């Protein structure tokens, strides 16, 4: 399944050219901001530091004027901004080094910044898929693979269903226009082997799982 990739890709995102008759239907990568939000908790971190700043200002304003207490919250805002910048930089690297591919026969995921691997998932090894779409249209397509397929959560992260360590489910994470990508996958899989089950689920519920 995963294979190290040390050679030049003949086609971006694929370690070798598809066999005769296999066509590329879609290629894409995660949205950088959506990946930072969904996988790295960017908004939660930002909110945490804002609350710290408000708490510091609130406590200090009990013993001094609010105008003097306001600057005391500034260090938390600066630290929070720096932390969010680091998280976004990590998401930028992860997204930039990722290429997802859907062909007429499989889903391929070229992932990894330091160690690049390519995961090939033939439609015959995909039991079902879940679709989670956010308000901005970006979302995640999660694949449940056959029981004999063993995948490493750490190697695939963040391209997995969050927190499902024992039963790792690979995912096309934080992709733009996720509903359309899921439709492309479903139609291709139906043509190949019969339609797999695609369940539309609440985005926050899937992200929390």
Predicted regions and their residues:
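Membrane-proximal intrinsically disordered regions of secretory-pathway and membrane-system proteins
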Residues: 1-7, 22, 118, 129, ...
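Short, charged cytosolic
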Residues: 2-28
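Long, distal/terminal scaffolding or interaction modules
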Residues: 20, 47-51, 120
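Residue-level signature of catalytic and energy-coupling elements of molecular machines
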Residues: 26, 107, 181
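Alpha-helical transmembrane spans
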Residues: 33-97
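Conserved beta-hairpin
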Residues: 83-128
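Acidic, Ser/Thr-rich low-complexity segments on the non-lumenal side of membrane proteins
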Residues: 111-151
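A membrane-cytosol interface segment of integral membrane proteins
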Residues: 135-209
């Amino acid at each position: 399944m995963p294979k190290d990739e040390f050679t030049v890709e003949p086609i971006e995102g694929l370690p070798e050219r598809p066999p005769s008759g296999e066509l590329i239907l879609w290629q894409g990568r995660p949205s950088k901001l959506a990946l930072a939000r969904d996988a790295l908790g960017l908004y939660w971190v930002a909110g945490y530091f804002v609350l710290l700043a408000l708490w510091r200002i609130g406590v200090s304003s009990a013993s001094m004027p609010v105008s003097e207490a306001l600057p005391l919250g500034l260090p938390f805002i600066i630290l929070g901004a720096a932390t969010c910048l680091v998280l976004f930089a990590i998401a930028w690297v992860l997204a930039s080094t990722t290429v997802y591919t859907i062909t007429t026969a499989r889903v391929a995921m070229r992932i990894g910044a330091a160690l690049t691997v390519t995961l090939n998932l033939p439609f015959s090894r995909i039991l079902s898929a879940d679709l989670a779409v956010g308000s901005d249209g970006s979302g995640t397509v999660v694949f449940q693979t056959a029981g004999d397929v063993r995948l490493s959560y750490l190697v695939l992260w963040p391209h997995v269903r969050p927190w499902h360590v024992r039963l790792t489910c690979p995912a096309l994470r934080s992709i733009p226009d996720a509903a359309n990508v899921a439709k492309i996958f479903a139609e291709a899989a139906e043509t190949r082997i019969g339609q797999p089950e695609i369940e539309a689920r609440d985005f926050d519920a899937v992200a929390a799982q």
